[in-house]
Design a protein with these regions (language model features):
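Structural detector for helix-capping/boundary residues
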Residues: 49, 63, 76, 116-119
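Conserved Nudix-box catalytic region and its N-terminal flanking loop in Nudix hydrolases
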Residues: 28-67
């Protein structure tokens, strides 16, 4: 099965890589509401961000979780790759929060966070398109988390 997808037919060329963290507790996914000062303000999505020069995707995932949520995570498994309409190659990884870590969002990047079931996430009208595409790919059986 394919682990790659395009999120729009009218996409820009891929110019930058990004890491997306899929963090699950039971049947709930960790989702964030993006702050009003970042790209796609107020949108609901999984945490993540750009890969810096010299970083691997896994290193970027760890760094972004520390920056956005103040937590140490352990990348577990690459599950999917997609391309955003803004020209990002999105690398979707499952990850686990290290024991004893407490989520403390950086309000400059994250307005709030919430643990939600898949149906709660996909029914949110503010869901970022790339996250809707992620759940659609799961429902098509392209991969499992």
């Amino acid at each position: 099965m394919s682990q790659e997808s395009e999120t729009s037919a009218s996409m820009q060329p891929v110019t930058k890589r990004a890491a997306v963290a899929i963090i699950i507790d039971g049947d709930k996914f960790l989702s964030i509401k993006r702050s009003r000062t970042v790209r796609a303000p107020g949108k609901i999505c999984f945490p993540g961000g750009g890969v810096e020069p010299g970083e691997t995707v896994e290193q970027a995932l760890v760094r972004e979780m520390q920056e956005e949520l103040g937590i140490a995570v352990r990348p577990i498994r690459f599950v999917w790759r997609s391309n955003s309409v803004r020209g990002f190659e999105l690398n979707w990884w499952t990850a686990e929060i290290e024991d004893g870590e407490v989520i403390t969002p950086d309000n400059n990047e994250v307005e709030s966070f919430k643990w939600r079931t898949q149906s709660e996430v996909v029914s949110d009208p503010e869901l970022l398109d790339s996250n809707a595409d992620f759940f659609a790919a799961i429902n098509r059986g392209e991969f499992e988390v």
